[in-house]
Regions:
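Soluble, non-membrane globular domain cores that form compact, hydrophobic packing
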Residues: 1-10, 16-245
Length: 245
């Protein structure tokens, strides 16, 4: 199992390894590579940007700091020392996680078991997927498309989940059920309309299967037109018009 988390303070990766795995192999490799050993077994091994770049300049920055939690079969990594410590504490049950956030739990509870999923808590999607990442012409086009669709209100959470049957579920959370009803038709239109800042239209890649509200959430189901490919990775960065705030 793998998970990736990102916030304005840093990013983290968490990997669960199988029972019986020899975690001494990992700590031994970290030692050999030049990481600074922590004072306790569950502490953070310190690498840093210079060490990681010297090992291999193509290595992701999220491997600069590593916590090896053998008793939980987990390895936690981050691009920031403080964030690695925080993520490791959460992984050990000593800090609040997204699971403690009612809005995140509510969104996840609306999904069947996915093959892969992305979750943006609170208003993080409003910046991470924002149209402000596009040029001014694309932003102007987006404003016009949103107005023609009927207007939208800001998100308070967003999830995208791909099922084993390759159906993409998009859950957009709002302040209340009234906002969800108001956003249902505009969000559905935007999800199959033009994709300013990305090129083409979303309907080039997806067919809208269904759209409905579920409490304070708008739930869209889309089926990719291609039988293979990495659908979520094409939507994990902005601009994404149907997630606009």
């Amino acid at each position: 199992m793998e998970a990736y988390g990102q916030s304005r303070q840093g990013a983290t990766m968490v990997v669960r390894l199988p029972d019986g795995f020899d975690f001494d192999k990992i700590t031994g490799h970290l030692d050999d590579l030049g990481f600074t050993r922590p004072s306790k077994d569950t502490g953070v091994w310190k690498g840093g940007v210079d060490l990681v770049a010297a090992i291999d300049p193509t290595i992701t920055p999220e491997l600069q700091y590593v916590a090896v939690l053998a008793d939980r079969h987990l390895v936690v990594t981050s691009d920031q020392l403080s964030y690695a410590k925080e993520a490791a504490a959460v992984a050990q049950g000593d800090g609040d996680s997204l699971g403690d956030l009612a809005s995140s739990r509510g969104l996840v509870s609306k999904l069947a078991e996915p093959a892969a999923a992305l979750l943006w808590s609170r208003d993080f999607a409003c910046s991470d997927l924002a149209m402000s990442q596009a040029d001014q012409d694309a932003q102007d086009q987006a404003d016009s498309l949103v107005a023609r669709a009927g207007g939208v209100t800001p998100l308070t959470g967003l999830v995208m989940a791909m099922s084993p049957q390759r159906v993409l579920t998009v859950g957009a959370l709002f302040e209340d059920s009234g906002q969800a009803r108001d956003n249902l038709r505009p969000r559905a239109r935007l999800a199959v309309g033009d994709a300013p800042g990305r090129g083409g239209t979303f309907s080039d890649d997806f067919r809208l299967v269904s759209s409905r509200t579920d409490g304070a959430a708008v739930m869209l189901q889309l089926r990719p037109k291609e039988r293979s490919g990495f659908v979520l990775s094409a939507l994990d960065h902005g601009p994404v018009l149907f997630a606009t705030c």
